[in-house]
Amino acid sequence: MSNEKQQWDDAYCLAEEMHDAGRPFKREELNIADQFICSRFSTIFEYDPYKDTYGFRNQELTHAIPVKSKCRHISDVDILELKKNTANADIRFPSYLNICPVYAMHPFTVLAFDLSKPVPMGMNASMENAAPNMKSPTEAEITPGTIYIFKHRDNKCYRCVILFEDGDNNVSDADRKYMVAFLDTPQVVSVKLKTLFHLGKFTIESYPCALYCCRAVGILEIRKDFGADLNGQINEFYKDKVKRKSGVHALIYKKDDRGDKLIFDCPSILGTSMTMALEIKDVIGHRSVAENDPTALSYDELVSKQLPTVDIDDHNSSVVLDLEESVIAQELGSTNGADCPCNNDNIDDFMQSQRQNPLDNNRDNWDRINESRSSMQSFAINQSQAITANPTPQPTFDESSGEVQTIPESINNLALNGRYLEDGRGTEEIREERSVESRQIGNQVVSQASCNYLEARQNSTQTANAESVCAIISESHAALPTDIQVIPSQHVLNENNHTVLPSVAPIIRNATGHSHIFGRQIPSPAFRRESLSSGNSIQVATFAATTGPCGSNTSRPTAQNTANSSINQDMSISNSSTNARLITIAQDNLNDTENWPNSEREQSATEMESGAEATTNSAVDEFAQVSDDMKGLADSMINFLRLTANSNNQDAFKANIFAMELISTKIPNQLTKRFFTLKIAEAKSLAEGFN
């Protein structure tokens, strides 16, 4: 009784220390006596097998009223003797053993009984002879993992290991029950304290047992809640006496890194067509994996008892070790004297040789690198000079060779680094970089564009969608009034025309207030002249909805006439354009309306914007707060995607779609992100041109 009283005093002091510290204690911080006490008072202390710590269960304790002890469940730190027995086991690897799983504990150790190993000779008879002189342990001496001798009523004796305390502890010490696993027979039972005796001379070192410590291949730790489920499966297998005696054929791959556990795998003990390791991983779950374990065999391979391939057999392993030892000895011997490669003299000689001739070995490679670098710099200078001389962005077309076009790297870098500002307040450097990059996309010769356009028109195998995209690009330049005002606009699509138009295009208003949704007039062979009701004849060129082959409401002109007209218009645009963003030409037939009366000017604007045959539209811009830089970037990328779709260049198309999606993820502003999402949807719709 005095021993139990002393344990309670120590337990109360430990609980007070943990409560004051407000943290659990590592098991290594505690001495052997404190570890012994914490393992017995599971009602006060909680053990975490994954962190190897003891924590105080928050509750009210009174020193005057002792709390009865109760042993916790066995853990991996309590089976040191069984691990030594496993390390000394004479087992060939890999090989099959007929085992019976007995119990599973955290973090992950399965106690498995080897049915093929016999009981040590003469041990049972010796224990029966020594039974009358055996001493019983007290309740204060019982801890999980301790090995005792269980004495049956027929005087037969069996060695067993304590798993945990079973049943109610509100009984006398002699009637307390403990769940034990036998070391020499596959059995797990609950026994009373009065039937247990000290081990004496029948230790595992003297008489090795057949109970081994194992773990499933590829699994280092199981989930904390899965321990009870796994033990439930083992109990289902264990209750069948036929299965318990016959066991299951398990493949023993090898011992683990520490050498005290067997890495095994076997068909599912529940009868499913899965291995035990695969069932834990895929069906129930695990906590962590063992990366250094060998590759597990499949269920069929385990059933057919196949052995895994081994790279180095046992016969050659010693040779490899001898070679490694000789190499190490040679390296250690070479460190003496001036022959050491790290000697100061050798280091100085090496540095001096590198100073004298640093590039002789790779001079050719360096020359090629410098040449490529110089050519790239020259190309950039020429491009800058050409842009300065002629700031007009030219329409771009793919060459006839069909080269892969990708979006300029600088645009991708700017998008990835988030240098485009959504609120429109960017620095001048950002504005200049975006302007130059957008010009580089469209800096090709007009004559080549017109020729490629003519070839695309004459090619009979060109698809309808590709023709539509080509027509929009080649006919996207027309005369505009000199005084214009650019305001944003919403996305407008002609439902009867399948040609994809920019989702956010600027609305351009002239001095009279006239506007149209596309940002610039698209010339067409079908022009009409209409006079206003005021009597002052103002001739306006209107577009007759002939931009696409699919939704055209009027007859299309011939390809030859359209091509010739486009060539003449492009040449005229190249010679007289001065606007960097919009290509404008003064129209002779557009009269000035400044001297008109206000009533006639308002009536003219009304008829132009709401007339039945007029193709213009005025709308409130939903994305007015989106910066011009982002709009320009989106328009440039979509124009480039039209070219890739027209040239059937799917690789460049996919790459630039991916670039737009990546830019969208970098945008913090929700309005700008929604704007760019619509642009991405519009860009993806251009993929129909590949069909």
Curated annotation (Swiss-Prot):
Free-text function comment from the UniProt entry: Acts downstream of piRNA production to promote mediator complex-dependent endogenous siRNA biogenesis from piRNA-target mRNAs in the RNA interference pathway in germ cells. Not required to identify target mRNA by the piRNA pathway. Plays a role in both spermatogenesis and oogenesis and in maintaining fertility over multiple generations, probably by directing mutator-dependent silencing to piRNA-targeted genes.
Name by which UniProt lists this protein: Protein simr-1
UniProt comment concerning the protein's domains: Tudor domain specifically binds peptides with symmetrically dimethylated arginines (sDMA) and may facilitate protein-protein interactions. The Tudor domain contains the conserved arginine and aspartic acid residues, which play a structural role, but lacks two of the four conserved aromatic residues, so it is unclear whether it is functional to recognize a methylated substrate.
Location in the cell: Cytoplasm, Perinuclear region
Region described as Disordered: 547-573, 588-618
A biological process from GO: spermatogenesis
GO cellular component: perinuclear region of cytoplasm
Sequence ranges of Polar residues compositional bias: 549-573, 588-598
